């Protein structure tokens, strides 16, 4: 990561921008105090690349052993009170057998630093050859239910609301005890988009940021009950979401028409994310330069 990142975040926050940092976590793990600098500058959330729980997965996907670095990055972010979202790339035959263990790591992390909002997202890498065993939403949901031993069930999940429902899935849970989750109301079709810009920014910031509000024993009053419940909802919510990106083998124009994750291109305007990253069979981008 660039050395002036804290300064960039600080300047952006002065203009009311919200920052979510996508990172492999190496610098966050190795440089003590760096997470704190980013937090002080105004960073809201770290989206941490987290492909599995063994070094073998990282050696295959990233070219080096990284599990200890991931653990250290999570620890440093938690100590700096930065919200954390775990973001794995799920590849068939590489780490699809570790989906449950990744979720378990997220839940265990909440137990150690329970005010951290943890999320889980799944992305499918693009292949130059037609994949024989592609990751699909039904397959991912089956893996989640099987590998969590029913802690999270297929029927818990809803499709996307703003985007095409075949593009993503999500569910939110409230932690109850060490290994019990209560499914929260499904919110398919609901979100922060159809409102003012200020309200949308506040929604995103509240959704992903670390919460520091707690009640000490004996501090509660009867009038605090609702506030305490709302704080618990924020502090102990565990969200699981996934997005299956399209490639040359399954590109669907109807899905692209509803895409709201776009790249701004000087030649092509607003290009849907999947189309922007689309390549031909020789690996040459069609829109991205």
Regions inferred by a protein language model and the residue ranges of each:
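Basic, glycine-rich polyanion-binding accessory segments appended to enzymes
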Residues: 204-267, 275
């Amino acid at each position: 990561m660039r050395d002036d990142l804290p300064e960039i975040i600080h300047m952006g926050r002065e203009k009311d921008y919200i920052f979510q940092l996508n990172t492999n976590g190496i610098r966050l793990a190795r440089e003590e105090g760096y997470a704190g600098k980013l937090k002080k500058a105004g960073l809201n959330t770290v989206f941490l690349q987290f492909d599995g729980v063994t070094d073998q997965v990282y050696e295959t996907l990233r070219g080096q052993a990284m599990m200890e670095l991931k653990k250290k990055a999570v620890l440093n972010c938690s100590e700096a009170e930065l919200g954390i979202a775990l973001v794995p790339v799920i590849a068939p035959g590489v780490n699809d057998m570790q989906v449950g263990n990744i979720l378990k790591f997220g839940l265990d992390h909440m137990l150690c630093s329970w005010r951290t909002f943890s999320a889980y997202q799944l992305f499918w890498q693009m292949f130059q050859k037609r994949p024989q065993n592609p990751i699909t939403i039904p397959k991912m949901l089956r893996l989640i239910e099987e590998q969590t031993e029913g802690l999270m069930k297929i029927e818990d999940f809803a499709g996307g609301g703003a985007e095409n429902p075949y593009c993503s899935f999500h569910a939110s849970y409230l932690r109850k005890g060490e290994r019990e989750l209560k499914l929260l109301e499904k919110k398919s079709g609901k979100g922060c988009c159809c409102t003012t810009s200020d309200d949308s920014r506040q929604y995103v910031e509240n959704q992903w940021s670390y919460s520091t509000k707690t009640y000490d024993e004996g501090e509660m009053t009867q009038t605090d009950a609702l506030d305490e419940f709302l704080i618990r909802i924020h502090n102990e919510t565990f969200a699981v979401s996934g997005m299956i990106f399209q490639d040359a083998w399954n590109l669907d124009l109807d899905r692209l028409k509803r895409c709201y994750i776009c790249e701004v291109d000087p030649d092509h305007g607003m290009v849907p994310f999947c189309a922007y990253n689309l390549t031909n069979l020789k690996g040459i981008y069609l829109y991205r330069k």
